[in-house]
Regions:
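ABC nucleotide-binding domain signature
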Residues: 32, 77-86
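Conserved structural motif at the start of ABC-family nucleotide-binding domains
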Residues: 3-5, 18
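ABC-family P-loop ATPase nucleotide-binding domains
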Residues: 89-156
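ABC ATPase NBD Q-loop/coupling interface
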Residues: 60-76, 144
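The feature captures the beta-strand-to-loop junction immediately N-terminal to the Walker
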Residues: 34-36
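Helix-to-loop junction immediately C-terminal to a conserved catalytic motif
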Residues: 49
């Protein structure tokens, strides 16, 4: 099972938001969580991401065979679980290419691996940009600055 949520209940500021929620997702499946405002969609996302404002009162969450409740936010993100914002922020003056290289090197160092050099990174970036349909020249822009909504999602 890729993601298994069993009987999850959660509160924020003492207010019960999720009550006995269960969901199983196999690898490769796509699920849409839908519902009216205030039904707990954002709470579920924040709980999965590990935001500390939320208290898990019962239930289990297993992601990629690991108990999420035992992992902090950074450990969850290293497994590939993180929140993607509906409206990603722009970061004027921060160029995408060095930003991505610094992010990758931080991840590699955390894994006790050698940092990637600029030449190797440029090669990997060019291949990845092509695979994602991102024009290579756009990688010289500031993070999300002046991007369309679709472009922002691809860069995420």
């Amino acid at each position: 099972m890729f993601l298994s949520i069993k009987n999850l209940s959660a509160t924020i500021d003492g207010k019960s938001i999720l009550n006995d929620f269960s969901l199983n997702i196999n690898e490769g499946e796509i699920h849409a969580i839908m519902g009216p405002n205030g039904c707990g969609k954002s709470t579920l996302a924040n709980v999965l991401a590990g935001k500390e404002d939320y208290e898990i009162t019962s239930g289990d969450i297993v992601f990629k065979n690991q108990n999420l409740l035992d992992l902090n936010i950074e450990e969850r993100s290293q497994l590939g679980l993180f929140l993607a914002f509906q409206y990603p922020i722009e970061i004027p003056g921060v160029n995408i290419t060095p930003f991505l290289k610094a992010s990758l090197n931080a991840k590699l160092l955390k894994e006790n691996k050698k940092e990637i050099d600029a030449i190797e990174f440029a090669k990997k970036l060019k291949i990845t940009a092509k695979d994602l349909g991102i024009p290579f020249e756009m990688l010289s822009r500031s993070v999300n600055e002046g991007f369309s909504g679709g472009e922002k999602k691809r860069y995420e």
